Amino acid sequence: MEINRDEFKEVVVNIGRVTKVVKGGRRFRFNALVVVGNKNGLVGFGLGKAKEVPDAIKKAVDDAFKNIIKVNVKGTTIAHDIEHKYNASKILLKPASEGTGVIAGGSARPVIELAGIKDILTKSLGSNNPYNVVRATIDALSRIKA
């Protein structure tokens, strides 16, 4: 599958800061969670870590392009209900009638929007850890049968 990066939009879902205390003070490192998608059925996510935020985002985008999945979209929504659990995060996805819009909270919204789904109902249950919610959403979307 040939991927043209120009067609893809990227959204930074989360930026985390990790502090290491050393004798001379504090050392900061950053991690970035990024979702990429072409709004036409292709979506992926990546995690990047670096000493500076822009470097972490660049690494995350590169990682996201290695993890792209194809989502089976039926019109403007999905074909059937699906529930998926990843670690302590659980996501519930339900098809919605046309004109409903994307009803999704937190980290699940960018994944669904970048996948090109326009009408869907979602509920995030359990842990709201951004990485786990994004991973659960992507895993759920990849399991949808056409």
Swiss-Prot record:
GO molecular function: rRNA binding; structural constituent of ribosome
PROSITE patterns from the UniProt entry: RIBOSOMAL_S5 (PS00585), S5_DSRBD (PS50881)
Subunit structure: Part of the 30S ribosomal subunit. Contacts proteins S4 and S8.
Record-linked InterPro entries: Ribosomal_Su5_D2-typ_SF (IPR020568), Ribosomal_uS5 (IPR000851), Ribosomal_uS5_bac-type (IPR005712), Ribosomal_uS5_C (IPR005324), Ribosomal_uS5_N (IPR013810), Ribosomal_uS5_N_CS (IPR018192), Ribsml_uS5_D2-typ_fold_subgr (IPR014721)
Function: With S4 and S12 plays an important role in translational accuracy. Located at the back of the 30S subunit body where it stabilizes the conformation of the head with respect to the body.
Keywords of this entry: Ribonucleoprotein, Ribosomal protein, RNA-binding, rRNA-binding
Coiled coil start-end: none
Keyword Ribosomal protein: yes
GO cellular component: small ribosomal subunit
Tagged with keyword Transferase: no
The S5 DRBM domain, residue ranges: 8-71
GO BP, sorted A to Z: translation
Family indicated by similarity: Belongs to the universal ribosomal protein uS5 family.
Pfam family, one: Ribosomal_S5_C
Domain remark in the UniProt entry: The N-terminal domain interacts with the head of the 30S subunit; the C-terminal domain interacts with the body and contacts protein S4. The interaction surface between S4 and S5 is involved in control of translational fidelity.
Protein name listed in UniProt: Small ribosomal subunit protein uS5
